[in-house]
């Protein structure tokens, strides 16, 4: 049974340290990091047990690295300055892109109800969410980096916190501090002035034991907990993304965690297993797992450069019988934000083209992608993610690639090779590579008229002119008989999402012709591990809608085309359904097919599990 949303409150998650990065870290560390001009109050028993939930106000300037992430001047989440351009926050604060892309970051903030001297507000240029974060398990790797569109000017009220040094860690029992503008009690009011609370770190064994008592137990090796079994002090809603900070031996404040989550606010977890209303410690994600990731991005963010070739010349031409393209020029570089790069590939006339991607690292298809066009500027598909697709056979002598990136993410781009092939099209080519064709033709199963092999997987995409529909006519059909056509079968879709299946065939009876409902038809053939037969052969023809007396509305939407995707491998763009903000330089290119970068391993299919 999942934890109900009103009980699971995302508020706390820790970052600790991995050894072996002293030179790297010292090269980027600000010598004035972790320095506050406000002396901390002496700790006693009562100040130790103060809390944000009903806790104490912070004197202005006490934690100059604390920032407020705001949407239309309303506080949404906290964050922590680690350099003049970089802020750390919680990944779950950035999970909703519609909100994330509208946020501004205010440093030097103290009282939310008024503008104060020393405040600085910057827009966000780049959002980088940890790759292992998932909204389905938001307590894992709940961390994100924000690159500012500008730089903070350091002074009395704006300074960076320190990142931990190699070998530096804070043992169980160490008292650390978290601050924020979160609720003063569970379900209570929001403060206007920054609050703080001191929290002891728990042992790993106690942390794991408490989490296993929950009705929906939580496990993982990334956790570190804070708090007291009797509760009473905690972070709460609105504190997400803020800092858990500890003073090191030199007195400098060091970032030990990022406010992420907890069960309730300040609840007791003593005798938790027998309680109806359970509680949890404040949970932190182990920084030893994410510090190298942080360092990689804040370093490369200062020096990364994409290739200048062709990006400044949108109609850049690459011609010849074969060649390659690396973008950026080195795998160790990252592509820049706000890019619009266009390449036109030309192989000799009357030749076709085979593309192979040897490297692919492009963020979400909503914001960063490589789009492919062919024949009269017609879109073939778009690529993103990290899983490499099979080779792609294009029935054309020219192709245009357009790469677009926005200001939210970056990655290492792509490498591809191209080669001209004589247009000796084989009807079973869809079993050797993803085959995209723009002309009528014949298709057949692998080895036809001999028996097809076990675990075969074949895919053809036909794209007719917009004024045409596509007709599939079988010449023969001999596929292993099974009652529901779930073992060996041919499927026909009028969209590449495979959401609009218009036919499914098996058995030994030649069916009637199939007519698509759009100018796109995807045909796939699959076989399982048991039994084979002769297979099939079919003809593809284009039929004018006018000949069929079918009218076309100017507002008619061509179905979005894509494949079923492994989770996280690709995303789908749909101009009507997409709620994300378009990249700054993205053109309105209408309905787009999205190419699956992980699914199309032609010729062999894995068994069912």
UniProtKB/Swiss-Prot annotation:
Its EC number is 3.4.21.-. PANTHER family: ACROSIN, ACROSIN-RELATED. GO terms for cellular component: extracellular region. This is Ovochymase-2. One of its GO terms (molecular function) is metal ion binding. Belongs to the peptidase S1 family. Pfam families: CUB (PF00431), Trypsin (PF00089). GO terms for biological process: fertilization; proteolysis.
């Amino acid at each position: 049974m999942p934890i109900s949303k009103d009980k699971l409150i995302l508020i706390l998650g820790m970052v600790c340290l991995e050894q072996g990065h002293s030179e790297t870290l010292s090269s980027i560390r600000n010598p004035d990091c972790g320095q506050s001009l406000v002396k901390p109050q002496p700790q006693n028993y009562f100040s130790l047990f103060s809390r944000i939930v009903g806790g104490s106000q912070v004197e202005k300037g006490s934690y100059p690295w604390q920032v407020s992430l705001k949407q239309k001047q309303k506080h949404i989440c906290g964050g922590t300055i680690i350099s003049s351009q970089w802020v750390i926050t919680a990944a779950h604060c950035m999970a909703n892109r519609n909100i994330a892309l509208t946020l501004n970051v205010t440093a030097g903030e103290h009282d939310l109800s008024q503008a104060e001297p020393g405040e600085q507000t910057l827009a966000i240029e780049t959002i980088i969410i940890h790759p292992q974060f998932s909204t389905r398990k938001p307590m894992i790797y709940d961390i994100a980096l924000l690159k500012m569109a500008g730089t903070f000017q350091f002074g009395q009220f704006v300074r960076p916190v320190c990142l931990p040094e190699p070998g530096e860690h804070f043992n169980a029992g160490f008292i650390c501090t978290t601050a924020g503008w979160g609720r003063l009690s569970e379900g209570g009011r929001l403060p206007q002035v920054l609050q703080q609370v001191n929290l002891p770190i728990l042992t790993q064994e106690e942390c794991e034991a408490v989490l296993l008592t929950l009705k929906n137990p939580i496990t993982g090796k990334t956790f570190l907990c804070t708090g007291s079994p009797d509760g009473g002090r905690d972070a709460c809603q609105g504190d997400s993304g803020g800092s858990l900070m500890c003073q090191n031996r030199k007195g400098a404040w060091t970032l030990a965690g990022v406010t992420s989550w907890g069960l309730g606010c300040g609840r007791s977890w003593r005798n938790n297993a027998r309680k109806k209303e359970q509680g949890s410690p404040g949970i932190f994600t182990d920084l030893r797992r994410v510090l190298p990731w942080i360092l990689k991005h804040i370093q490369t963010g200062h020096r990364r450069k994409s290739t200048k070739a062709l990006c400044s010349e949108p109609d850049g031409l690459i011609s010849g019988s074969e060649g390659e393209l690396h973008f950026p020029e080195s795998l160790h570089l990252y592509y820049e934000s706000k890019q619009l790069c266009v390449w036109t590939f030309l192989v000799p006339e009357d030749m076709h083209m085979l593309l192979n991607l040897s490297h692919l690292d492009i963020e979400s298809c909503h914001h960063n992608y490589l789009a492919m066009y062919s024949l009269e500027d017609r879109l073939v598909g778009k690529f993103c993610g990290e899983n490499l697709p099979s080779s792609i056979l294009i029935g054309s002598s020219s192709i245009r690639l357009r790469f677009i990136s926005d200001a939210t993410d970056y990655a290492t781009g792509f490498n591809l090779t191209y080669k001209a092939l004589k247009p000796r099209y084989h009807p079973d080519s869809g079993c050797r590579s993803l085959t995209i064709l723009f002309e009528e033709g014949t298709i057949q199963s692998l080895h036809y008229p001999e028996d097809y092999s076990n675990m075969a997987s074949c895919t053809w995409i036909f794209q007719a002119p917009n004024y045409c529909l596509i007709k599939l006519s079988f010449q023969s059909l001999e596929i292993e008989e099974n009652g529901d056509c779930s073992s060996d079968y041919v499927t026909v879709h009028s969209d590449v999402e495979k959401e609009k299946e218009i036919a499914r065939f098996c058995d030994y009876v030649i069916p009637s012709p199939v007519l698509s409902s759009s100018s796109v038809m995807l045909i796939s053939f699959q076989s399982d591990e048991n039994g084979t037969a002769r297979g099939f052969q079919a003809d593809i023809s284009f039929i004018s809608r006018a000949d069929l007396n079918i009218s076309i509305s100017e507002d008619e939407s061509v179905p979005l085309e894509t494949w079923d995707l492994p989770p996280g491998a690709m995303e789908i763009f749909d101009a009507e359904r997409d709620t994300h903000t378009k990249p700054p330089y993205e053109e309105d290119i209408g309905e787009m097919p999205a190419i699956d970068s992980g699914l199309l391993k032609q010729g062999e299919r894995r068994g069912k599990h």
